[in-house]
Amino acid sequence: METRKIIHVDMDAFYASVEQRDFPEYKGKPLIVGGPPNSRSVVSAASYEARKFGVRSAMPCSKAAQLAPQAIFVFPRFEVYKEVSKQIREIFLEYTDLVEMLSLDEGYLDVTFNKKNIPFAVTIAKEIRTEIFKRTELTASAGVGNSKFISKLASEKNKPNGLTVVLPDDVISFIDPLPVSSFHGVGKVTARKMKELGIYTGKDLRTKSIDELVQHFGKMGIYYYKISRGEDERMVQSSRERKSLGAESTFDRDKLDYDDLLKQLKDVAVVVERRLEKKDFAGKTLTLKIKFYDFSLKTRSKTLSEPIFKADELYSTAIELFEEFFEIKYGKKSAIKAIRLLGISLSHPNSENEDPNLFLNL
């Protein structure tokens, strides 16, 4: 069987780099794409100059301003980013039709059998990065491997403007020293739980039996067992139509307080808005997901007359669904039982089956 050749291409600080390209006065300066510095908006992107101060995507703009008071704040220009993204996708399609765009600034390519009959994936990755820079004046990082999991990890290895190749025989030695927090599917809460079990690196994860991992992480334990061995059979899906998108947040401590939970819900709505904008997605059906301290799960949905995508619309709709889970206790509004997770998703009204990756950890 032919060994798969998968490339993951990820643009470097995409939104910020487009702004620095179009406005030369921003070059070499800490630049933050998002809302005003004194707002509750979140950072959509930060230039590498801003990242040196600790500024990261999804961080509140107010916090970013504290970390980098000299930073320049600009509003995102999504129409411009979408046009550049189309240019990038056109380059990908010159090599293969098996292109899966994850967002405006990154995607997978399966080049096992490619249009130019180039035998080496690394050659294609080099050509793509060169062509992207030639046509857009932007840099991209790329990873080459035999699976989606490996190629994505590889693309993150030498950012910005880097290329990392992981040969099939080197997969285990590549995975072993990496922190599990860098693995797709391992969020902050899971990483913390893994550390409690003595799992810090890929090698630590690989020493655990499948039974141990299932005991502690449920069905995801099987996934963790496989990826620690470099096993990932997911195909590059060129025709995938996104039907839903959302985000969820797991709390360090279970929460009862109404006002505190509303703040958490607002934060989730802001992150969902950012992801919707990045994916150019809107939907009519909002689903609220609540997990209680005893791991019981409740979901409630509402279908609207028009598609929505803004945080305030998501938040106000979610609150309507949220109310039934509260009661007045001792003159104070509290959850009917302690809540450990909140999630919001948006989908098309004809989406019959939820995407298992719908709720991405914050």
From Swiss-Prot:
Cofactors demanded by this protein: Mg(2+)
Keywords: Cytoplasm, DNA damage, DNA repair, DNA replication, DNA-binding, DNA-directed DNA polymerase, Magnesium, Metal-binding, Mutator protein, Nucleotidyltransferase, Transferase
CDD domains in the record: PolY_Pol_IV_kappa
Localization: Cytoplasm
Cofactor note: Binds 2 magnesium ions per subunit.
GO molecular function, one term: damaged DNA binding
Catalytic activity: DNA(n) + a 2'-deoxyribonucleoside 5'-triphosphate = DNA(n+1) + diphosphate
Coiled coil: none
Subunit structure: Monomer.
Protein name as catalogued: DNA polymerase IV
